[in-house]
From Swiss-Prot:
Cited PANTHER family: 50S RIBOSOMAL PROTEIN L28, LARGE RIBOSOMAL SUBUNIT PROTEIN BL28A
GO biological process: translation
Record's signal peptide: none
The UniProt record lists the keyword Signal: no
GO cellular component: ribonucleoprotein complex; ribosome
Name used for this protein in its record: Large ribosomal subunit protein bL28
Xref: Pfam families: Ribosomal_L28 (PF00830)
UniProt similarity note: Belongs to the bacterial ribosomal protein bL28 family.
Gene Ontology MF annotations: structural constituent of ribosome
KW Coiled coil (keyword) present: no
Keywords linked to the UniProt accession: Ribonucleoprotein, Ribosomal protein
Length: 76
């Protein structure tokens, strides 16, 4: 099952973790240097909930919490 919100279409986004080493210039050092860049994913907070449909029925969907808080979905 794809990690995509059925309402907003939110999906995982690529990003990275940047590790740095050294003392900052502000603290009297010669500056920080990048030692490692690791790829990672930012995943949306998806919940599998029962949603009320406009025709009166219900359906289970993967919905992001952002959509729930915004009131875009009515829980059954």
């Amino acid at each position: 099952m794809a990690r995509i919100c059925a309402i907003t279409g939110r999906r995982p986004v690529k990003g990275s973790i940047i590790n740095r080493k050294g003392q900052s210039k502000k603290s009297g050092g010669i500056g920080t240097h990048v030692t490692t860049i690791t790829k990672r994913k930012f995943r949306p907070n998806l919940q599998r909930i029962r949603v009320k449909l406009p025709n009166g029925g219900t359906k289970r969907m993967l919905v992001s919490v952002k959509a729930l808080k915004a009131g875009l979905v009515e829980k059954a």
